[in-house]
Amino acid sequence: MAVAIAAARVWRPNRGLSQAALLLLWRPGARGLARSHPHRQQQQFSSLDDKPQFPGASAEFIDKLEFIQPNVISGIPIYRVMDRQGQIINPSEDPHLPKEKVLKLYKSMTLLNTMDRILYESQRQGRISFYMTNYGEEGTHVGSAAALDNTDLVFGQYREAGVLMYRDYPLELFMAQCYGNISDLGKGRQMPVHYGCKERHFVTISSPLATQIPQAVGAAYAAKRANANRVVICYFGEGAASEGDAHAGFNFAATLECPIIFFCRNNGYAISTPTSEQYRGDGIAARGPGYGIMSIRVDGNDVFAVYNATKEARRRAVAENQPFLIEAMTYRIGHHSTSDDSSAYRSVDEVNYWDKQDHPISRLRHYLLSQGWWDEEQEKAWRKQSRKKVMKAFEQAERKPKPNPNLLFSDVYQEMPAQLRKQQESLARHLQTYGEHYPLEHFDK
């Protein structure tokens, strides 16, 4: 409109134009055209005064053909608080957490590590059908969980068991879910590691990759409209960030100004695909500004860096109603799952480096030792105690029966429709006739 007005001010009416044509050219505010006179001196016009008015972007005109080159600047820096020996680098960034809270961080990570080892071996022995470990990524879980309010809603992917662990989710329920027994909150309907807990505001995990991202945005939008003073945090891996749902979620969150934290665990591999084959840009954090999202990249093996970033993101997300993106750089030490053999696509030396030289548990242990809050005797006692606790829950879960097969048909409708009741009756007749072919003794009566 401004360009049209400027042009109108220097335009001389052609005597051949009718009065009607002149009226069609005039618009409110274009006074120069309405008052123009053939003998009035033209105003000087400079292209420097021509400012972009396009509604889609805020920018300046340039007169040189130049494409934007990828990675022309150095990569987004990685924020950290502790070095690999657990020493605080910049005292002003020390969160100064009390001893009790730091010990809870450490015990949550080590308890998760112990549970992982036992359940991984139980799958290898055929006791459960599937499992996914969290080796190497424990710091991203508990560091972020500690910075949230307990009522903040969590949407996980499938490798965030530490968030529930920090929220005091009982070991018995972890085991019940993996075994699919009668104590499982999901009534045995989900495959292992698909946890969920309404009381702890942890939305049940679903297998399809990245579906939780737009769902989390919807929940955050609802929280905003309800003035709930809560944030939604959505976890995902860098592989899931390549899914279309990630784009939809990022864009909706930015345009609807939702109080959400997108937490990306960049662990180096999307199953067997390394990051070098996943994207050419500067990781995931670099995508945030393009959507209008505040973004940061942190050392995911530094639990304090994760804590600080999440705490500040939460504060601002609630206060300002805007999304934040945290990319936590870490490494998946374990196999993708019990269905994967990572030795086929990475070296043992590579894995050993991260396990021995830059493990989040080791880093926090160094910090505790330097503070005088932990010693080797306490370490041995806790490791023994944690294993005993996990084994007790493990043995209890193994002894409990599976849910009654009739529960397959419940919790779908408030009142069971005729078609579903017909299927239930059909299953009952089938089991009555051929029950000896099924391990019904393992199911609740």
Swiss-Prot record:
Belongs to the BCKDHA family. Mg(2+) binds at residues 238, 267, 269. SUPFAM superfamilies: Thiamin diphosphate-binding fold (THDP-binding). Its cofactor is thiamine diphosphate; Mg(2+). It comes from Macaca fascicularis (Crab-eating macaque). CDD domains: TPP_E1_PDC_ADC_BCADC. The keyword Acetylation applies. One of its GO terms (cellular component) is branched-chain alpha-ketoacid dehydrogenase complex. Phosphorylated at Ser-337 by BCKDK and dephosphorylated by protein phosphatase PPM1K. It holds the Pfam family E1_dh. The lineage of its organism: Eukaryota, Metazoa, Chordata, Craniata, Vertebrata. The modification Phosphothreonine is found at residue 338. Thiamine diphosphate binds at residues 158-159, 207, 239-240, 265, 336. Its EC number is 1.2.4.4. It is found in: Mitochondrion matrix. Keywords: Acetylation, Magnesium, Metal-binding, Mitochondrion, Oxidoreductase, Phosphoprotein, Potassium, Thiamine pyrophosphate, Transit peptide. This is 2-oxoisovalerate dehydrogenase subunit alpha, mitochondrial. It catalyses: N(6)-[(R)-lipoyl]-L-lysyl-[protein] + 3-methyl-2-oxobutanoate + H(+) = N(6)-[(R)-S(8)-2-methylpropanoyldihydrolipoyl]-L-lysyl-[protein] + CO2. InterPro entries: Alpha-ketoacid_DH_E1_comp, DH_E1, THDP-binding. Together with BCKDHB forms the heterotetrameric E1 subunit of the mitochondrial branched-chain alpha-ketoacid dehydrogenase (BCKD) complex. The BCKD complex catalyzes the multi-step oxidative decarboxylation of alpha-ketoacids derived from the branched-chain amino-acids valine, leucine and isoleucine producing CO2 and acyl-CoA which is subsequently utilized to produce energy. The E1 subunit catalyzes the first step with the decarboxylation of the alpha-ketoacid forming an enzyme-product intermediate. It is an enzyme of class 1 (oxidoreductase). GO terms for biological process: branched-chain amino acid catabolic process. Residues 1-45 form a transit peptide.
